[in-house]
Amino acid sequence: MTIQDLVGTYSISGSNQDESNEITYKGVLTLTLDQNNRIKADWIINSHKQKGTGFFKDNILVINFSYKGDDHKTYKGVAVYRCITKDVLDGFWSEKHGDPLYLGSEYCLRMETTERLN
């Protein structure tokens, strides 16, 4: 798998960085490449935008992200995805000011995929 294979739009579902493992949000993740062939990520979750940049190696995608909270502060974190196929990403994430005892989780499925889920 190459970094170019990951470019596209994904439907996401995830859980927040707390003790609950239940799906707490859904949204869309769009991955593109910049002029240096690095990943640019744009999330839309519950009408909120998040952005990030990242890199890819050995089927692992790492994205440093940030967003403005409702309190107008900028929050930052890192997301790590295992690229199961070019259409399925399974990941976890952590924010700087999140609960350090837990990780958030995120599952991504390419929106135009023909792959079936189990």
PLM-predicted stretches and their roles:
Residues 1-118:
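Central antiparallel beta-sheet cores of small beta-barrel/beta-sandwich binding domains
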